[in-house]
Amino acid sequence: MKVHFLGTAAAEGFPNVFCRCQACQDSRKAKGRNIRTRSSVIIDDAWRVDYPPDAYYQAVRDEIDMSKVNHLLLTHTHYDHLCAGDLLSRTEGFAHGVEEPLNIYGNDLALHQCRIGFFRGRQYSKAIYDEKINTF
C-alpha cells in the first residue's frame, strides 16, 4: 500500500498566515516541509481522502496526476476538508482525457454539497458519481 500525505495541518494551515507567534515565524523562515497544508492523503494513487482548499496546490506541488484518482472519501464537510466547488474542474469542458469516473463517498451533507450546493444541478456527464456512506 502506498500512502502519500498531501497535508497534515489543521484548518488554518501552518503557519497561520495571520499569526505572529514564534512557531509560525520560525516556520516561515525555515520554509520547505515546515509549511504545512490542510489535511489530505492519497492512497495507491487511486484514493483521495478529503478535498481541502489546498487540493490544487497539493497536486501541483507533489506532481499528482489527479485524473488517476477515481475514489474520493469525504470524512466530513468542514471547509478545510471539502472544497466541493473545485471539483467542477474535473467535469467535461474543463478536464480532457479523464477515462474513469470519480466515485465520491460521504455522508448526505457532503454529497449534497458536491451534487447540488456547488454545481447547482449541472450534469456530471460521467465524470462524477456519488455514493452515500451510512454512519454509525
What are these regions (language model features)?
Residues M1-F136:
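Binuclear metal-dependent hydrolase catalytic cores
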